[in-house]
């Protein structure tokens, strides 16, 4: 996470130690994810796949200091859960960084039952829980008044937008991009259905780029050939390395994220930092980035009519949206850059009465 690299040297921070079970998970590494920058940062102590004795030694060394232990991915990686339980033996302050409950196919009550049976016992030992987005803050607050529930966000590596000139032939077209897997949960079909609801004239003012692959690609390609999408240019770009995504994004005006559920949706951060307008489903944590109206619009997940209205509004205001590129970049630098997120994160830790 880029904000981690910004923590060293900030007021109140003496040491930053990152303990991880592994680096560059295979499937993400193949897409271009890299941890080289973090590993090369000499201001941060990186501990990779440590033995339990090594973790014990770190807890013992820092328990008599003002130490926060933050756990991210505690349910996904068994070693992290073991390290969390080990931390309970030491005098350190604990916090959790988590995505909201994964509700796609798993209703909230199922998560509540699991939490009651497996996790409730630990609540009194956790001071703060940082939740991605603001959609399920109330769920976590119901469990206890002892911990502070804080809306949080992912952030991505900062990329500078490169100057470019809009092609003349696309001057009045909204160029709309999707980046992600082509699965039922990501719901790209809803995006195409929404475009089918546009008028023939509106469709001639729209082109769509789709980056990604998945089990629904063949179905989506069939939909794209429908007469109901006549006039819309739909281009399937396939899977692309992560380091090529910023360059692709800068060829578009807006990004759409139509997911039925996304814990966050970091592609939204990338889009805004490059100045794109962002159309986001209300079942994505990244909808929190749209509190500023000029950043984009939120639509009801799975509602093609509502998404069509967002697309129509974007088409009708294409000039203003293009004029707002620099404003979105400036807002992103101030609010969702690594430094901005690090400052927000640290302010919650330092403000703790026990700190």
Label each PLM-derived region with a short phrase.
Residues 167-186, 192-195, 209:
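Conserved donor-binding/catalytic core segment of Leloir-type glycosyltransferases
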Residues 292-293, 297-304, 313-319:
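Conserved acidic donor-binding segment of nucleotide-sugar-dependent glycosyltransferases
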Residues 277-280:
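Short hydrophobic beta-strand element within catalytic cores of glycosyltransferases
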Residues 239-240, 247-252:
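Short alpha-helical donor nucleotide-sugar binding micro-motif in glycosyltransferases
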Residues 42-46, 221-240:
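Nucleotide-activated donor-binding/catalytic signature segment of Leloir-type glycosyltransferases, i.e.
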Residues 119-120, 124-165, 171:
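Donor nucleotide-sugar binding/catalytic pocket of nucleotide-sugar-dependent glycosyltransferases
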Residues 260:
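Aromatic "clamp/platform" in nucleotide-sugar-dependent glycosyltransferases that forms part
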Residues 319-350:
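A charged, aromatic-enriched C-terminal amphipathic alpha-helix characteristic of glycosyltransferases
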């Amino acid at each position: 996470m880029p904000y981690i690299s910004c923590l060293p040297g900030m007021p109140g921070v003496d040491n930053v130690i990152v303990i991880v079970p592994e680096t560059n998970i295979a499937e993400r590494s193949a897409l271009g994810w890299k941890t080289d920058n973090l590993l090369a940062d000499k201001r941060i102590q990186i501990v990779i796949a440590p033995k339990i004795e090594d973790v014990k030694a770190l807890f013992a060394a820092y328990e008599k200091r003002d130490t926060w232990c933050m756990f991210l991915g505690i349910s996904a990686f068994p070693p992290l859960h073991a390290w969390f339980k080990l931390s309970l033996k030491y005098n350190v302050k604990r916090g959790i960084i988590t995505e909201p409950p994964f509700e796609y196919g798993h209703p909230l009550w199922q998560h509540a039952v699991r939490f009651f049976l497996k996790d409730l016992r630990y609540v009194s030992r956790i001071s703060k829980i940082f939740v991605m987005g603001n959609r399920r803050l109330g769920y976590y607050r119901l469990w206890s008044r002892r911990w502070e529930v804080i809306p949080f966000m992912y952030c991505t590596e900062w990329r500078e937008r490169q100057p470019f000139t809009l092609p003349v032939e696309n001057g009045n077209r909204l160029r709309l991009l999707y980046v992600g897997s082509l699965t039922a949960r990501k719901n790209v079909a809803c995006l195409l259905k929404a475009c089918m609801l546009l008028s023939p004239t509106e469709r001639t003012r729209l082109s769509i780029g789709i980056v990604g692959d998945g089990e629904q690609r063949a179905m989506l390609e069939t939909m794209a050939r429908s007469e109901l999408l006549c006039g819309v240019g739909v281009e399937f770009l396939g899977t692309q390395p992560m380091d090529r995504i910023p360059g692709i994004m800068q060829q578009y005006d807006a990004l759409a994220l139509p997911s039925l559920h996304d814990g966050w949706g970091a592609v939204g951060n990338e889009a805004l930092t490059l100045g794109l307008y962002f159309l986001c489903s209300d079942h994505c944590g990244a909808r929190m980035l749209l509190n500023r109206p000029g950043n984009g619009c939120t639509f009801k997940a799975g509602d093609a009519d509502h998404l069509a209205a967002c697309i129509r509004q974007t088409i009708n205001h294409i000039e203003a949206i293009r004029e707002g590129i620099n404003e979105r970049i400036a807002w992103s630098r101030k609010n969702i850059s690594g430094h901005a997120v690090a400052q927000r994160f640290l302010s919650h830790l330092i403000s703790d009465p026990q700190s």
